[in-house]
């Protein structure tokens, strides 16, 4: 049997007539799928910080749809809720993927997927052509027989690692099978940008009440700016504040969802978040001048996507006896042995200039409304024009 390693290396770094209805429906579908992935990961993560990148997780699965046949293809379509074999879906996704990459001054957004193929492995010409046209994807030859070759490929493709980052390859080595791989898919979503409105460089230590009730002193960033803000209620009656912080060039924004009641845990809000609800909230945000307090945080996660997909009914893809990926190669026996997702996000003052008189602003009383994220919150890194979600996560303890 031929082993296919599906690696998802996702490293975001942060310092919407008939056709329109279809596009809106697909946007909501993708957001609901992203939220489903978030809930699946959150359920297994217990009381921990979390970040994941739905965009990078689903692009390789879309590529696999081009090569999946029979029950394998049906399971993928049922899990995703759409199929790239539908011309309208394919056209919409290609349009979205085409407009996402950005190299505006002060902002950089990259979206890519590379399919590494063992030298000598025959591939279907149709599949090769489809890969070349999908989400800035490309095909490269590799020799997986060399020691640690898959690790080097994955780590070399993604943005440079920093101290403390665990190589994706180490997760593969624990799972095994790398040396027998014939294909490796590596997906990257990379975002780096300065804020449109600068945070002060004079960050102060302020209290943050963690999920367990423990209060810690954490680096709390501050700015006074015109922002999009609203106060809403979820279907269960929980009150939340929603704030949108734009990045330079409007290439993306950070959407924050904060419970108004300090005694309301995120676990009471997470099950009620839907794409329709988020759309209604963001459409109702109003411009307001506010004082914004946001903790500096850095989160890195990696997890086995295979377990989640298995719980979604994607079973045959990982079974060497049942997987049907004949659209990739004329050879029998291709299956996916590993699906590793790795994501990182860093929210800080970097890339912005210092503001004056910050200490006074932090301490004085003011009639200006305040948004203070001094307790657990949920965040969405998204493209504002298409509502495309790059990353979802939560902060339970900014120091972890």
Swiss-Prot record:
Signal peptide (from-to): 1-19
GO molecular-function terms, A-Z: serine-type endopeptidase inhibitor activity
Gene Ontology CC annotation, any one: extracellular space
Marked site: Reactive bond: 365-366
Entry annotated with the keyword Membrane: no
Compartments, as annotated in UniProt: Secreted
Glycosylated sites: 46
Keyword annotations of the record: Glycoprotein, Protease inhibitor, Secreted, Serine protease inhibitor, Signal
Biological role stated in the UniProt entry: Probable serine protease inhibitor.
Family per record: Belongs to the serpin family.
Name of the protein in its database record: Serpin E3
């Amino acid at each position: 049997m031929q082993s296919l390693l599906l690696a998802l290396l996702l490293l975001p770094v942060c310092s919407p007539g008939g056709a329109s209805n279809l596009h809106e429906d697909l946007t909501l579908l993708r957001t609901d799928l992203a939220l489903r992935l978030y809930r699946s990961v959150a359920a297994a993560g217990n009381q921990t910080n979390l970040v994941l990148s739905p965009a990078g997780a689903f692009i390789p699965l879309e590529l696999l749809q081009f090569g999946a046949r029979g029950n394998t293809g049906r399971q993928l379509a049922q899990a995703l809720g759409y199929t790239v074999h539908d011309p309208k879906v394919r056209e919409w996704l290609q349009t979205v993927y085409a407009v996402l990459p950005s190299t505006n001054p002060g902002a950089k957004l990259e979206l890519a997927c590379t399919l590494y193929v063992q030298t000598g492995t025959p591939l279907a010409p149709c599949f090769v052509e489809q890969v070349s046209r999908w989400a800035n994807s490309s095909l490269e030859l590799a020799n997986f027989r060399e020691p640690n070759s898959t690790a080097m490929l994955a780590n070399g493709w993604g943005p440079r690692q920093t101290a403390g980052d665990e190589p994706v390859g180490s997760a593969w080595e624990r799972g095994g099978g790398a040396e027998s791989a014939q294909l490796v898919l590596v997906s990257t979503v990379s975002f780096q940008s300065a804020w449109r409105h600068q945070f002060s460089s004079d960050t102060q230590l302020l209290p943050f009440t963690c999920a367990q009730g423990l209060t810690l002193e954490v680096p709390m960033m501050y700015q006074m700016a015109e922002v999009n803000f609203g106060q809403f209620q979820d279907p269960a009656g929980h009150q939340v504040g929603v704030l949108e912080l734009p990045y330079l060039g409007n290439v993306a924004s950070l959407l924050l969802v904060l419970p108004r009641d300090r005694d309301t845990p995120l676990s009471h809000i997470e099950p009620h978040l839907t794409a329709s609800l988020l759309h209604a909230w963001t459409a109702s945000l109003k411009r307001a001048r506010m004082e914004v307090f946001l903790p500096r945080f850095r989160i890195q996660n990696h997890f086995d996507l295979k377990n989640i997909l298995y719980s979604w009914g994607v079973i045959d893809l990982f079974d060497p006896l049942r997987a049907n990926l004949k659209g990739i190669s004329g050879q029998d026996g291709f299956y996916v042995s590993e699906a590793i997702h790795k994501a990182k996000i860093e929210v800080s003052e970097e890339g912005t200039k210092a503001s004056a008189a910050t200490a006074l602003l932090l301490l004085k009383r003011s009639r200006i409304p305040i948004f203070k994220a001094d307790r657990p919150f949920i965040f969405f890194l998204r493209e504002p024009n298409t509502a495309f979600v790059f990353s979802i996560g939560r902060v339970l303890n900014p120091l972890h």
